[in-house]
Amino acid sequence: MNASTTRRRFGQFTLVATAAALLTPLNAGVANAAEASETPTSSPAAYINYLESTSEIGADQTLKDFKALDAIHQKRYLNYLNDPDVFEDLLEEAADGSAPPNTKSLSDTGKLSTTDSATSEGGDIVLEKETNATFIPDAPLKGQLGTQALSRGTWTSHYTVSQKIFGITVTKLKAEVNYYTTGRKVTRVNWANGQVRNFNAVVAISKGIPKAWLSGGTAYGQVTWEGSIVYKGFGIQLDKVHRVWANHNGYQGGYLRNV
């Protein structure tokens, strides 16, 4: 499902750029102290050096994709990274990914993935909200009638928000919850986790301690993202709650909201 967005300004916001991924504090080797005026997003050469210097998983692909852009699009890409208004728009769009109550969102194939997207900046930027799940089944029971919403076993449901600029995944944030269902109800929540991949060099994102719980037959997983814009002109702080929930019918919802 696609929806277009327009540029908006909000009086106050807390950053999570789509929704890409773990931005560890900027690599010490990325910025040369002798070049105090240069940041990893100040020029295509500086950004390429940043990607070549980081050990983050996926950096090689991002580097390849960025190099494939022509000079004009490389400059526009970096302008978007340095523009806080872009993150305002993305935050608004990433707020909610809930399904209608008790939607049977998963099947016995053991895996299902759905993706919604919204565009901004004339299609240059795409925000994707993805839901998916994986399944480890129990051995079939004799006489099982197959009337369950889900198969008996252990499920992991995910809610992921990603930002793409010119088709390049810049930041990806994922919340996930692992739980056990008898096929008719959730009986146990095992764990929750969050994953982050980020190649926006002006944003530092860290993960809080994940939380998992069972309430009213629904499994919940939650993680808090904390961080800041490290580019001197922004002064934006990050404080977002990323939550996902599921029941015996499968994935039921997720959101990315201000704390």
Which residues make up each language-model segment?
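N-terminal propeptides/leader regions of secreted preproproteins
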Residues: 29-151
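Short, intrinsically disordered low-complexity segments
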Residues: 6-8, 128, 151, 242
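Residues at structural and domain junctions
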Residues: 19-20, 63, 161
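Mature secreted bioactive peptide module from preproproteins
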Residues: 136-259
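Generic N-terminal initiation segments characterized by hydrophobic and/or small/turn-forming residues
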Residues: 12, 19-23, 103, 147, ...
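Secretory targeting and sorting signals
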Residues: 1-35
